[in-house]
Amino acid sequence: MMTSPQPASKGFSRAFWVSSTVELFERMAYYAVFIVLTIYLSNILGFNDFESSMISGLFSGGLYLLPIFTGAYADKIGFRKSMIIAFSLLSIGYLGLGLLPTLLEAAGLVEYGETTRFSGLPDSNDRWMIIPVLFVIMVGGSFIKSIISGSVAKETTEATRARGYSIFYMMVNIGAFTGKTVVDPLRNVIGEQAYIYINYFSAAMTVLALLAVILLYKSAHTAGEGKSMREIGQGFLRIITNWRLLILILIVTGFWMVQQQLYATMPKYVIRMAGETAKPGWIANVNPFVVVCCVSFITRWMAKRTAITSMN
């Protein structure tokens, strides 16, 4: 008979704290790269503004679409195996982002330094090797979108769930804040090469998360209990025929379309308007900083109010 692991801290299990901590590492890795992804695509790989925006946008869209399928697969194999798969893919992907420019430079298509000097890369099809690399990150990240929050739900009770998610989202935003503070100081020291080396930082963070899961994540809620593809399809059909839910999705989509401009266009805009000494990472950090400072207070304040009241 399986027994529940002893709690690592009053009210929460060790699995809860491991899940929250590896999410912090994952967010550090993701935002360290994503805050400069469009700049990386243009300044390192030679894509124009339209191409880099399209690639970044499709990457983000896929990252939020794939959890429909990867989440169902994660349910079948269990959270621990899913996290191992996710962080393995993310580590490979971020390492690939760092190594790809080295291969392109070795091919004589570009020379990297404080500033990038192209010698054929913008006209070469070799730069499109970035697509499979980003796809690996997209698949790994799509697992994380569903399994970490699902693990938190499994490891909390009705009495501790609100506080548990408050802690979880605080860790998410600490990770987002910390990740975006790395690239600007690095850019001040080594110039545009920072957009390459930041990927090794992200790979290191996801390797740490992978080791934490392998060595520390033990949960009573590991058995797969997933749905069939038919059940997933039926559930999806119910969603798209629920007009109230669709309206909510459209409202939330509008918010995220605006919010994503912090990463799609703002970094390039700030650097081009204010010069190379500008720090877009710190500008983008206003959002997670406010969340970290206010999330506990807001959670307590809205605890006895309905979700609709909170959203309004």
What does each model-identified segment do?
Residues M2-S13, A223-I249:
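Juxtamembrane intracellular "pre-TM" segments in multi-pass secondary transporters
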Residues Y31-I39, G179, W243-A284:
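Extracytoplasmic gate region of multi-pass secondary transporters
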Residues G57-A72, N285-I298:
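Central cavity-lining transmembrane alpha-helices of secondary-active solute carriers
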Residues G62-L63, A162-R187, A203-A209, A284-P288:
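Glycine-rich segments within core transmembrane alpha-helices of 12-TM secondary carriers
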Residues S88-N125:
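C-terminal ends and interior cores of transmembrane alpha-helices
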Residues I131, I196-L215:
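Symmetry-related core transmembrane helices of the 12-TM Major Facilitator Superfamily/SLC fold
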Residues F143-T157, V270:
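Intracellular juxtamembrane helix-capping segments at the cytosolic ends
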